[in-house]
């Protein structure tokens, strides 16, 4: 599992598995992206980020406040080819991002600093950090940084049908564990928070069926939870 100490000390070239050198962003590129994002800040209020995937259950960041909320206009989609972390170039999986349309519930965090966040999320620059309005469940509306999939990125995948991506997620694994573990952690966190994402239902059923067929005795690969 990713921790704050892991992120602080991680060498991005090796810590998450083998990443194609042409895709890997340097510390300078990440710093420039962060500066450009903050320069577009729509107000002088605190900096919030919106977690819709692993940021929900394992932010690995210091934050001063958190609150559940809803992002309108975007929906979860496993549209990022996963070749590190929980997948490899030879056995790629799929990672979560956001695509236009619909709505997404998640967790917003108010951050005291953002540098480590960029190291966590922007290793290959696959996202477009975008300021969006969030409707928090306590009644507030805040501007937050949301990591939206960049469709121009080489690892963007447009086909997110369950029958296409379920076999990939069921099979992929890497230094951080299995791809299925990520999907099931998302399912558990949504249940814990009383949230529902109907777009995940078919995918969850398909991945669980594939794992049951491949591991009939319930013996799963290391890292599965």
Name what the model sees in each region:
Residues 1-225:
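A glycine-rich, hydrophobic/aromatic-adjacent loop/helix-cap motif
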